[in-house]
C-alpha cells in the first residue's frame, strides 16, 4: 500500500498545526466558511473544536492539554479547553490592542511568545485579498512575551517588523521570529537581556520568476539544529543551517504552505497548505526539537 503524501485534504485554508502524542493534529481553518479550530486524526476523522468567529491563525498547547489560539480576526489570544470552552482571553498589553495575533511558541521559562503581524485585518485586506500596495503600509509587527498564568503581556521584545509571522525557540533557548515581507529571520537573546536586540539570522526567499507574494510563515527547529521554515508562495520548506545559510529547499505539492509541525513519532514534517487546503506529509532527516509544554493550571 503506497503512503499518501497527505495527512488530510479538503480543509478550509489550514494553519497552526499542533502534533499530538497519539498521532492526531490540531489545525486552524481560516477560510471564510470555516473560521475554526479542528482536530484531525490520521484515519480521516475530524472534529470541530471551536468556531471562533474571527480568523484563527497559530496554535500552541500547554502542559495541561489546553489550546492557545492566536486569533487574528478577533485581535486576541484565547485559551480554550479541548471541548471548546473558553478559559482566558487577552486582547492587548494594557495600553494598546493587539493588531493581528499570528503565531505562538512556549519558551523554556513557561512563558508564551507571540508574533503580531502589525496591522489589523481590516486595514490591509480588500475582501479576501490583500489591498493594493499593502507591502508599503505602516506595518508595526511585534514580538510579545506573555505570562500565561496571569494572562498579561510582560514585555514587547521587538516592534516595527514588516509582517511578523513564524516563531520558534532553538536548542540554546534563543528566540527566532520572521518577517514575511523582506523574507528575513531574526534572532533574539531573550534570556540574556531585558531588551534583546534584533539580530539578523538568515533569509528564506529564492530568486525566481514567480509574480505574487512570497514570504516566510510558520517554522520549527529539527533535532539536527536546522530551522525548517515554510515559505508561502514559494512551494517549499526552506531549511536554514545553524549559521543561517540556506541548507535545503524541500519542495511541496502546494504553492502556499503556511506552517509546519514535526510529528511526535519520527521523521515527518506536517505542513499546512492553503492553496488547495490540505496537510502535506514531508519526509525529513530528523525528528523535531521537542517543544515546551508548561503547566499553566
At which residue positions do the language-model features occur?
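Short loop/turn segments that connect beta-strands within beta-propeller blades
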Residues: 40-44, 81-85, 147-150, 189-193, ...
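Short, solvent-exposed loop/turn segments at conserved positions within beta-propeller repeat blades
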Residues: 30-34, 72-73, 121-140, 180-181, ...
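Blade-level signature of beta-propeller repeat domains, shared across WD40, Kelch, NHL, RCC1
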Residues: 259-297
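A short loop-to-beta-strand structural motif that recurs across blades of beta-propeller domains
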Residues: 36-38, 76-78, 141-144, 184-186, ...
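Asp-box/WD-like beta-propeller blade repeats and closely related beta-sheet repeat scaffolds
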Residues: 77-132, 140
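Beta-rich, blade/repeat-based domains predominating
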Residues: 9-22, 52-71, 94-112, 137-142, ...
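A short beta-strand motif characteristic of beta-propeller blades
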Residues: 2-8, 44-50, 85-94, 152-158, ...
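Glycine/small-residue-rich hydrophobic helix-like segments
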Residues: 186-258
Amino acid at each position: 500500500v503506497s503512503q499518501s503524501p497527505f495527512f488530510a485534504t479538503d480543509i478550509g485554508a489550514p494553519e497552526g498545526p499542533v502534533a499530538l502524542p497519539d498521532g492526531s493534529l490540531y489545525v486552524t481553518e481560516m477560510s471564510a466558511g470555516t473560521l475554526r479550530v479542528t482536530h484531525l486524526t490520521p484515519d480521516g476523522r475530524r472534529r470541530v473544536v471551536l468556531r471562533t468567529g474571527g480568523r484563527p491563525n497559530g496554535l500552541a498547547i500547554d502542559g495541561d492539554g489546553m489550546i492557545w489560539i492566536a486569533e487574528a480576526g478577533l485581535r486576541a489570544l484565547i485559551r480554550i479547553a479541548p471541548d471548546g470552552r473558553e478559559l482566558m482571553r487577552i486582547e492587548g498589553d494594557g495600553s494598546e490592542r493587539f493588531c493581528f495575533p499570528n503565531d505562538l511558541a512556549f519558551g523554556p521559562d513557561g512563558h508564551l511568545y507571540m508574533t503580531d503581524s502589525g496591522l489589523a485585518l481590516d486595514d490591509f485586506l480588500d475582501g479576501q485579498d490583500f489591498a493594493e500596495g499593502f507591502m508599503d503600509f505602516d506595518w508595526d509587527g511585534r514580538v510579545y512575551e506573555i505570562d500565561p498564568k496571569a494572562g498579561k503581556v510582560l514585555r514587547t521584545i521587538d516592534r516595527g517588523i514588516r509582517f511578523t509571522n513564524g516563531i520558534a525557540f532553538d536548542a540554546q533557548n534563543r528566540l527566532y521570529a520572521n518577517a514575511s515581507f523582506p523574507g528575513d529571520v531574526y534572532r533574539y537573546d531573550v534570556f540574556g537581556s531585558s531588551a534583546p536586540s534584533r539580530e539578523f539570522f538568515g533569509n528564506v526567499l529564492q530568486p525566481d520568476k514567480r509574480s505574487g507574494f512570497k514570504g516566510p510563515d510558520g517554522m520549527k527547529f529539527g533535532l539536527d539544529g536546522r530551522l525548517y521554515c515554510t515559505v508561502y508562495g514559494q512551494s517549499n520548506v526552506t531549511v536554514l543551517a545553524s549559521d543561517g545559510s540556506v541548507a535545503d529547499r524541500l519542495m511541496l505539492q502546494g504553492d502556499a504552505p503556511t506552517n509546519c509541525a514535526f510529528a511526535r513519532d519520527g521523521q515527518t514534517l506536517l505542513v499546512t497548505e492553503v492553496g488547495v487546503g490540505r496537510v502535506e506529509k514531508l519526509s525529513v532527516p530528523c525528528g523535531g526539537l521537542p517543544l515546551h509544554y508548561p503547566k499553566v493550571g
